[in-house]
From Swiss-Prot:
This is ATP synthase gamma chain. The lineage of its organism: Bacteria, Bacillati, Cyanobacteriota, Cyanophyceae, Synechococcales. It is found in: Cellular thylakoid membrane. One of its GO terms (molecular function) is ATP binding. It comes from Prochlorococcus marinus (strain MIT 9312). The gene is atpG. Coiled coil: none annotated. Produces ATP from ADP in the presence of a proton gradient across the membrane. The gamma chain is believed to be important in regulating ATPase activity and the flow of protons through the CF(0) complex. It is a peripheral membrane protein. Belongs to the ATPase gamma chain family. The keyword Transport applies. Keywords: ATP synthesis, CF(1), Hydrogen ion transport, Ion transport, Membrane, Thylakoid, Transport.
Amino acid sequence: MANLKEIRDRIVSVKNTRKITEAMRLVAAAKVRRAQDQVLKSRPFADKLARVLENIQSRVQFEAVDSPLLSKRDVKTISLVCITADRGLCGGYNTNIIKKVEIRYAELIKQGYEPNLILVGKKAIGYFQNRKDRYIIKTTFKELEQVPTAKDSEGITSEVLAEFLSENADRVEIIYTKFITLVSCAPVVQTLLPLDPQGIADENDEIFRLTTKDSKLLVEKSNIEKSDSEKLPSDIVFEQSPDQLLDSLLPLYLQNQVLRALQESAASELACRMTAMNNASDNAKELASTLNLTYNKARQAAITQEILEVVGGSAV
């Protein structure tokens, strides 16, 4: 059994570690709130844009419009946009998304396609750059804002558009972590290009708000309120041709899709970090309790031994 000083030092170390993990949990909880607020602030524009596209689609058949972002061609090369975090300490968040990318990459090769990667986040960059013999990396993005903004999505969108319009990629897919609840998230694959505008917000999307009660974090859940679709007047006349309208609106739509993926990934990362730090704090508390029990037993054994030595000495 370890001596009393070693056990006492371990108890102090575990308690200090618990203070750190508890602080990180609270910071992550605050940032989850910010990420949620950012999603709510960006949603009205995204929803309005979707409504406009739906109205234009009702007036103009997209199939008859000659837009490169809508055109489907024979697929040979596919670009995969992979979104991970720049940092760790967030449970299985990075591992799960990387595993999803590996599975999707292998599936595409098996189907006869030529996939390549557009990496977002230091964790994905570090992992796949160490495996360059197995994966083709086109571009990398790192050190984005912790709460993604339109500026962050602009660079990724420009790269995706350049790849698709230059026909270096016949299809572009994005792999990110969908925010489901504060304790649940899942990697998903979504096709970015060619576009198929059918609305931005999922009808099943829900908003999760963090609240506090008795010094504990609680979660409130509510469904997103869908705004009523505003129909364009039937006698409206477009000054621009449908091609010109869509050439202006579709890149905005694409950028919003990328921004939404970034925001959901950020919220998922923070939720995973909060959960991981909460588990670490609980484990540290349990370990400290076990060490205290061990310390008390060792101290009791030492005192008993001293008493026996005193009694034995006096008997002699």
